[in-house]
């Protein structure tokens, strides 16, 4: 599935459920570097897990991410603060 498809899927979920469903996406890319449809999809979601999975940084104790370089970003709070706000999970 490409980023444009993901963005349209998020729009469909929002149309059907409003904000009653939390939408998480995993990008494999750095949040600040996203462009185009990938950026649209990220900004339309509630939480973004960014950064590539790096096997050398794998940590099974981490919740919702595979390696310690990945961030769990609260999108709304990040947009409001105009800086990255990570969720502590």
Range-by-range predicted roles:
Residues 1-14, 58-89:
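P-loop/Walker A phosphate-binding loop and immediately adjacent motor/lid segment at beta-alpha junctions
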């Amino acid at each position: 599935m490409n980023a444009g498809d993901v963005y349209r899927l998020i729009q469909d979920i929002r149309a059907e459920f409003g904000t009653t469903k939390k939408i998480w996406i995993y990008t494999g890319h750095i949040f600040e570097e996203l462009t185009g449809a990938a950026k649209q999809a990220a900004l339309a979601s509630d939480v973004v897990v960014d950064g590539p999975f790096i096997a050398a940084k794998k940590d099974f104790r981490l919740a919702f991410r595979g390696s310690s370089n990945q961030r769990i970003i609260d999108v709304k709070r990040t947009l409001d603060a105009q800086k990255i706000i990570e969720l502590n999970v």
